[in-house]
Design a protein with these regions (language model features):
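Alpha/beta-hydrolase superfamily serine-hydrolase fold, recognizing
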Residues: 7, 11-32, 43, 47-51, ...
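Short secondary-structure junctions
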Residues: 66-70
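Feature marks short, highly hydrophobic, charge-poor N-terminal signal-anchor/signal peptide-like helices
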Residues: 1-6
Length: 339
């Protein structure tokens, strides 16, 4: 076979494979409700690619830049210790909020490999404005440069800082909620577990399509399709980066992944929301089931036709996503009402 013919055959194979991928993508996207279709669905990204990750690290923090009028945003730092660096925080509050009142520690998403607290400016300032509470965002260290337990430790130290400074911050320590989205939701769940073990009060956990179980990577056919925003390839890279090694069936490191904890007894009430097209849907449903089985009140919302991150893309544009976020706010508001 001549070189020209070999290249021609190779080109035909690549073209055929590309056509098959495009066909599969369009077939998968056909199940997404028309109101939830967004250009992001047509641009699958592999965050295992260093160049893609570098660009995303610059772009993602800008996605939530808008701050609600009347909300003051300030930078704070959890002091460094002999073994840990300082942790940068953003606080959001209105001038007239009730003191002492409730507080939300909110942990951003990004697979533990992307993101920053400021990407949640719009969401955190909305909560501060509408509920009149203090919101604290955490700039935790990212993987793979900083594998476990770096991000977990940073978020737990932020919770301890919130408790230690509750009086100065105008916060009731009995009204502190921990929450987050995606990887931030998974970190929130492990922080809540550690807080329970160390006697640090947490009122409620607000988990938005949380990334809870590294063993999802080990499944041959993870729930959902590889074409919806957060893909199996990105999930595999993110867990490898966070764990510092590929996931294994057995991993006894405490707080490594929320779903690995055997005993969920005594954890605070929870709200878990996820879309039925989200790769995390099965692990989130299972965690909610186990919380309930352990005696913890847990409201589970599984949104039909919703893929990972759809609410952030379409809040205020698609009624279903506006309702999803409103449900989160309602759950948080109810949790912060004193008994």
């Amino acid at each position: 076979m001549t070189l020209r013919r070999a290249l021609g055959v190779l080109g035909a194979v690549v073209a055929l494979k590309g056509a098959m991928v495009i066909t599969a993508r369009h077939r998968a996207l056909a199940v997404v409700p028309s109101e939830l279709r967004h250009p992001a669905l047509y641009v699958p990204l592999n965050f295992g690619n260093a160049a893609v990750r570098a660009i995303a690290r610059q772009a993602v923090p800008l996605t939530g830049a808008t701050i609600r009028p009347g909300v003051r945003v300030e930078r704070c730092t959890v002091p460094a210790t002999a073994t840990n660096p300082g942790v940068n925080l953003l606080t959001y509050q209105t001038a007239g909020r009730h003191k002492p009142g409730g507080a939300l520690l909110w942990i951003h998403g990004g697979g533990t490999v992307l993101g920053a607290a400021r990407q949640e400016n719009a969401w955190c300032s909305r909560i501060a404005a509408e509920l009149g509470v203090l919101v604290v965002g955490v700039d935790y260290r990212l993987a793979p440069e900083n594998p476990f337990p770096a991000a977990h430790d940073d978020c737990y130290r932020a919770l301890r800082w919130l408790h230690d400074n509750a009086t100065d911050l105008g916060v009731d320590p009995e009204l502190i909620v921990v929450g987050g989205e995606s990887a931030g939701g998974g970190l929130a769940a492990t922080v809540v577990q550690r807080a329970h073990d160390t006697g640090v009060p947490v009122r409620f956990q607000l988990l938005e399509y949380p990334m809870l179980d590294d063993r999802t990577v080990l499944r041959l056919d993870p729930h959902g399709s590889s074409v919806y925003t957060w893909t199996p390839a990105s999930n595999r890279f993110a867990w490898n980066a966070y764990l510092g090694r590929p996931p294994q069936e057995r991993d006894d490191r405490p707080y490594i992944a929320a779903a690995r904890r055997a005993d969920l007894t005594g954890l605070p009430p929870a709200w878990i929301g996820v879309g039925d097209l989200d790769l995390f849907c099965p692990e989130d449903i299972e965690y909610a089931r186990r919380l309930r089985e352990a005696g913890t009140a847990c409201e589970l919302r599984v949104e039909p036709g919703m893929y990972h991150g759809a609410d952030a893309l379409l809040d205020g544009k698609a009624p279903a996503m506006t309702a999803f976020r409103t449900a989160m706010l309602d759950a948080l508001s109810a949790a912060l009402i004193e008994p």
